[in-house]
Amino acid sequence: MISKNIKLVKGVLDSLVEDSKGLVVMDFGCGKGVFAEHLKELGHKYIGVDIDRDALEGLSERGFTTYHPDNLPKDLGVDILLLGNMGGIETGMHLINARKLLTYEGVVFMWDFSYQGLPKGKSQSTVAMSVVSKGG
């Protein structure tokens, strides 16, 4: 069963790739690549990046391009960079470095469903999702 959160992200992804084919989408912190098949079906190239070598191996076996963050080429021409549920990772530095991977009109899409760090008074059902940055 697909969770509400994944459905929500897929909906935003669909709007980002709408009317496009052949975009390069990099999923930073991809895990098992929950969006890989969906993006492939829509005609886009999916690249998974994670520190979990087992997860990367599973994605590779399914025919997807994968990289460990330490071995990431700088010339991939990424159109959409996905940064989801990054947890304790220093997000600010990732955003700075991520912009270097993007094409001129590339987009960083960041979301977090962990609810940690929400201002007091916000319910856990509040989810912050936004297009964070345009490359260039």
Predicted feature residues:
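Conserved alpha-helix/loop element of class I SAM-dependent methyltransferases that forms part
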Residues: 2-21
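Class I SAM-dependent methyltransferase SAM/SAH-binding core
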Residues: 34-66
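Conserved beta-strand signature within the Rossmann-like core of class I S-adenosyl-L-methionine
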Residues: 105-113
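Core SAM-dependent methyltransferase catalytic element
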Residues: 125-136
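Conserved beta-strand/loop positions that form the S-adenosyl-L-methionine
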Residues: 28
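A short glycine-rich, Lys/Arg-flanked "PGG" loop and its adjoining helix->strand segment in the class I
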Residues: 93-104
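Conserved glycine-rich SAM-binding loop
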Residues: 31
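A short SAM/SAH-binding and catalytic strip from SAM-dependent methyltransferases
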Residues: 79-92
